[in-house]
Amino acid sequence: MSPRKTYILKLYVAGNTPNSMRALKTLRDILENEFRGVYALKVIDVLKNPQLAEADKILATPTLAKILPPPVRRIIGDLSDRERVLIGLDLLYDEISEEMLGSAELDTLADDDIASPDS
């Protein structure tokens, strides 16, 4: 089994607002439950560090960016929907692919889907 990828994420927030705190809490819950220690999260307050927001072309908060592994993906706005966050960052697809690749069901399904010349 190959080692799991490490995900590098940046969460851009605007101050210590309820929306920012909710986004951070939801994101940490998702990361702890789904990625257990194989991630690094940097929280950037765009009010304290506007140059970082400008350099990364952040126009709205909260914005979550997946930096690594490529490609870079961003999700802007409400982060309360777990599935939306995972799909938006291409994380759910990786999770499903790894599960399928490790299962015997994939082999069975692939064999059943191959059409024989007789049919």
UniProtKB/Swiss-Prot annotation:
One of its GO terms (biological process) is circadian rhythm. It holds the Pfam family KaiB. Signal peptide: none annotated. PANTHER family: CIRCADIAN CLOCK PROTEIN KAIB2, KAIB-LIKE PROTEIN 1. Component of the KaiBC clock protein complex, which constitutes the main circadian regulator in cyanobacteria; it may modify the ATPase activity of KaiC. May be a metamorphic protein which reversibly switches between an inactive tetrameric fold and a rare, thioredoxin-like monomeric fold (KaiB(fs)). KaiB(fs) binds phospho-KaiC, and perhaps clock output effectors. Belongs to the KaiB family. This is Circadian clock oscillator protein KaiB. It comes from Prochlorococcus marinus (strain MIT 9313). The lineage of its organism: Bacteria, Bacillati, Cyanobacteriota, Cyanophyceae, Synechococcales. The gene is kaiB.
